[in-house]
Amino acid sequence: MLEGWFLWFILFWVIMMVVLLSIGGFFMFRKFLKRLPKEDGRSELDWQDYYIENSRHLWNDENKQFLDELTAPVPELFRDAAKAKIAGKIGELALKEKVAKIDQQLMIKGYILATPKRDHTFLKRHLRDKKIDLEPYQTLLK
């Protein structure tokens, strides 16, 4: 039987592995749920890709640069996923409103709708730094 420090090392290692595998499994399961088709036959990620593809012609270089600025605080590992989610929401709004071109107002609205409330503090600070009026977005920010 195991005794002493080696027993504690093995127990610590087993607990650590279970915790790390649980955390990884949680995130993998969330991604799996987003890939599952809904009632309409498409998953959340399929719709996101659809909106990005169909609104691609509405984007210009300034909009892409502004999206890069908005996703700058996101860690590099998750930045592409964050950009895709935000761009998908902006594309959805653009297609539903049938706009001719995506403008900054639509991008801010899409960012607010696509991100959790905790990210809105960065948006407010960034918009103040760029001297953009927050008043039109107050109802969305609450």
UniProtKB/Swiss-Prot annotation:
Keywords: Cell membrane, Membrane, Transmembrane, Transmembrane helix. InterPro entries: YneK. The chain crosses the membrane at residues 6-26. It is found in: Cell membrane. Signal peptide: none annotated. It is a single-pass membrane protein. Interacts with the N-terminal D1 domain of dynamin-like protein DynA. This is Membrane protein YneK.
